UniProtKB/Swiss-Prot annotation:
Residue ranges crossing the lipid bilayer per the database entry: 10-28, 35-57, 72-91
Membrane topology value: Multi-pass membrane protein
Phylogenetic classification of the source organism: Archaea, Methanobacteriati, Methanobacteriota, Archaeoglobi, Archaeoglobales
Annotated compartments: Cell membrane
Source organism (scientific name): Archaeoglobus fulgidus (strain ATCC 49558 / DSM 4304 / JCM 9628 / NBRC 100126 / VC-16)
Protein name: Uncharacterized protein AF_1598
């Protein structure tokens, strides 16, 4: 089940909690993507240096597999890594579209 979330609320809570809400959001989105068929590893890899780069690649790969089939996982990985502030907006927008369709 995909949850529709407000982008404004996502960013405001992320700023107010100094980024802690973004980590919580990543955990919740990872669960949703995995329930839709992605294969994203445990979020504990987020706190391990170097392993967090691998985790972000696997997240981008799962995002593309579930929500953007036919597009490049490497492109989304680079986008998420280099311009990470827009990553929640891209991912949540796609999840919101899926939630509106009833996915």
């Amino acid at each position: 089940m995909v949850t529709k979330r407000s982008l404004l609320k996502l960013y405001l809570l992320g700023i107010v909690t100094l980024g802690i809400y973004f980590i919580y959001w990543l955990v919740m989105v990872k669960r949703e993507l995995n329930s839709l068929g992605a294969n994203i590893p445990t979020c504990w890899l987020l706190i391990i240096p170097i392993a967090n780069i691998y985790w972000l690649y696997k997240f981008a790969e799962g995002f593309v597999k579930v929500l953007k089939p036919g597009e490049s996982a490497v492109l989304y990985f680079l986008l998420f890594w280099l311009v990470s502030i827009i990553m929640p907006a891209i991912v949540q927008s796609e999840l919101n579209k899926l939630a509106e369709r009833g996915g």
